[in-house]
C-alpha cells in the first residue's frame, strides 16, 4: 500500500512541475546597448503564451528591442531596405527570451 501511495505522490509532484508557469524577461524597451530603459521585470507565460524577443536592426546595428510574454507569437525575420525586424518566441526554459 505504501508503495502505491508513494507512486501516486510522485506522479502528482511530476504533474505539478509540468504545469508551472514559464517565467520570461519583461522589458518594454531595450536600448541599442541592450540595456532595459523601462525597468526590467519578469512575466509569467501561462495558457499557451510564450516568451518573446523582438529586435530591430538598422544598417546591421542593433537599435532597440522588446521582451515579454505574448499570447500570439511567431518566429520570423523581416527585411525592408536597411531595416531588419527579428521576432523570436520560446517556451523551452525560463528566461529564454534574453538576447
Swiss-Prot record:
The keyword Repeat does not apply. Coiled coil: none annotated. Induction: By testosterone. Keywords: Disulfide bond, Glycoprotein, Secreted, Signal. GO terms for cellular component: extracellular space. Its main location: secreted. This is Prostate and testis expressed protein 14. It comes from Mus musculus.
